[in-house]
Structure formats: C-alpha cells, structure tokens
C-alpha cells in the first residue's frame, strides 16, 4: 500500500469530535440517572465512568438473579425438561 493510500485509509477511519460527542450523548441517554439531567452538559469522561459503573451494577444484578434462580430451581418441583432448559439459559 502506498503512503498516500495509507493516509487516506487512516483519515477515513478517524472519528470526528462531533461523532464522539454524538456517541457520548447516546450513551448518556441509556443511563438511568443521566436521563434526568439530559439537558445538562456532562463531560465525556464522566459519562464513560457512569457507564462503566452501571455495567458493573448490571453484572452484579445478573449474578444475583442467576444465583436466586438456581436456588429456586433446586427447591422447586420442576420437570427435568424444564429444568434443563432453564439451566441451559443460565450458562
């Protein structure tokens, strides 16, 4: 690949500040607490930190619910076929 074509390829792959801002705004709209203050200008770093925290909390919630479901399965009178389907979903 020539130097000129590499330069064109790398510039085409670059994302603009406007695109980053748009993506951060969309990400902020997905955060439950951020929706309340969607009109406020929040720094991108803060949105990313809140997103990471939210994802971690969702992981914890999934783990807790999976554990709870496993306990219910162990205690419930569930047919073998139903239990196999539910266990398969948990994996």
Swiss-Prot record:
Q: Has the keyword Transcription been applied to this entry?
A: yes
Give the molecular function GO annotations.
Answer: protein dimerization activity
The residue ranges of the bHLH domain are: 4-58
Keyword Transcription belongs to the record? yes
* Keywords, sorted A to Z: Growth regulation, Transcription, Transcription regulation
Residue runs in coiled coils: none
Q: Name one Pfam family in it.
A: bHLH_ILI
Which GO annotations describe the biological process of this protein? regulation of DNA-templated transcription; regulation of growth
Would you identify the family this protein belongs to, as annotated?
Answer: Belongs to the bHLH protein family.
Q: What does this protein do?
A: Atypical and probable non DNA-binding bHLH transcription factor that integrates multiple signaling pathways to regulate cell elongation and plant development.
The cross-references to PANTHER family, in alphabetical order and at most eight, read: TRANSCRIPTION FACTOR ILI7, TRANSCRIPTION FACTOR PRE
Q: What is this protein called?
A: Transcription factor ILI7
| Species annotation | Oryza sativa subsp. japonica
- The record's gene field reads ILI7
């Amino acid at each position: 690949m020539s130097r000129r074509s590499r330069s064109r390829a790398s510039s085409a792959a670059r994302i603009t500040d406007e695109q980053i801002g748009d993506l951060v705004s969309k990400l902020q709209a997905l955060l439950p607490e951020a929706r309340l203050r969607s009109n406020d200008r929040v720094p991108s770093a803060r949105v990313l930190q809140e997103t990471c925290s939210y994802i971690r909390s969702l992981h914890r919630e999934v783990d807790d619910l999976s554990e709870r479901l496993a306990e219910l399965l162990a205690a419930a009178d569930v047919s073998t076929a139903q239990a196999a389907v539910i266990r398969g979903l948990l994996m």
